[in-house]
Amino acid sequence: MHSKSRITAIGTYVPDQILSNNDLEKMVHTNDEWIVQRTGMRERRIASEEEYSSNLAIKAIENLCTTYKKNLEDVDCIIVATTTADYVFPSVACQIQQYFNIPHTLAFDLNATCAGFTYGLHVGNSLITSESHEKVLVVATETLSKVTDYTDRTTCILFGDGAGAILLERDENTPSFIAAHMGTNGDGGIHLYRTNLSTTMNGTPLQTNEKIVQNGREVYKWATRTVPKGIKNLLHTVNMQVDDIDWFIPHSANLRMIESICEKSQIPIQKTLTSVEYMGNTSSVTIPLALNLAIKEGKLNNGDTLLLYGFGGGLTHLGLIVEWNLI
């Protein structure tokens, strides 16, 4: 894989409000032990009524700029991964452009659900490597609490809100991206969806309350079958072994799912970074949250080789091997 871009900054944000397992016990028939055993989750963050995906994204970008002393004036592309945009249109990316007054930039949202962040990184790297862009801001932001059915205990225990942002800049000497592997299984879309205009999918009637609908059993089977194969293919493309990977950062869908993927891929769970325990499933945001948490804990070092793997609704997945050189 050819690359001319490097990750030069990262920022994250989560709302203040905490939704604990004990809180959920008061809302649906569940308990802390049941949730932890099945998901590994203890808490998740919830946006206020006045907070939307654009607000969370802006705060994550501000965190990036403050932490790494970055200026956004010369950003020439904004990519936002989200399934919970404030509006059908305009895009969250356009709202970000307006807020930061970035003068000359491409701006668009992409919807790849839980794989959205790795999709965004892959597209951003491709734009820079093709020499059409120089500086790309990749953002993941979700307010899943606004589209979660809090009467459905199979889904309401899972989802939380948050945002993450990464800056990509041209650097031909120390590029970040080593390899990519991706795939789509659109026939599984019925297993994880949220309706908009259509009330059927491939002739099958849909639940039309505009909340997240998930067949957890089928999604689990797909992910634990597909992601290990994807990891194997990803490593094979660059003649690498599992031992060459310093850290595995999968989408934090569910800790039990991650444990199964690790077991099938022969990746030690100790080499895995997640955000699942105290942030829940934040869809496209789980990977940047896990990365920034690892930075704060002093786990990531320059030169580390990371394997990022996003997967989810679509059904779709995209994995990346990245050299971490956040100087």
Swiss-Prot record:
Cellular-component GO terms for this entry: cytoplasm
Region annotation (ACP-binding) ranges: 252-256
Database matches in SUPFAM superfamilies: Thiolase-like
Reactions it catalyzes: malonyl-[ACP] + acetyl-CoA + H(+) = 3-oxobutanoyl-[ACP] + CO2 + CoA
Pfam families: ACP_syn_III, ACP_syn_III_C
Gene Ontology terms, MF aspect: 3-oxoacyl-[acyl-carrier-protein] synthase activity; beta-ketoacyl-acyl-carrier-protein synthase III activity
Pathway noted in the entry: Lipid metabolism; fatty acid biosynthesis
Subcellular location: Cytoplasm
Lipid biosynthesis listed as a keyword: yes
One of the protein's GO biological processes: secondary metabolite biosynthetic process
Active site residues per record: 114, 251, 281
Superkingdom of the source species: Bacteria
Main subcellular localisation: cytoplasm
Keyword Lipid biosynthesis in annotation: yes
Key words of the record: Acyltransferase, Cytoplasm, Fatty acid biosynthesis, Fatty acid metabolism, Lipid biosynthesis, Lipid metabolism, Multifunctional enzyme, Transferase
The protein's Enzyme Commission number: 2.3.1.180
Domain comment in the entry: The last Arg residue of the ACP-binding site is essential for the weak association between ACP/AcpP and FabH.
UniProt subunit comment: Homodimer.
Family, similarity comment: Belongs to the thiolase-like superfamily. FabH family.
Function: Catalyzes the condensation reaction of fatty acid synthesis by the addition to an acyl acceptor of two carbons from malonyl-ACP. Catalyzes the first condensation reaction which initiates fatty acid synthesis and may therefore play a role in governing the total rate of fatty acid production. Possesses both acetoacetyl-ACP synthase and acetyl transacylase activities. Its substrate specificity determines the biosynthesis of branched-chain and/or straight-chain of fatty acids.
Descriptive protein name: Beta-ketoacyl-[acyl-carrier-protein] synthase III 2
Lineage of the species this protein comes from: Bacteria, Bacillati, Bacillota, Bacilli, Bacillales
Gene encoding the protein: fabH2
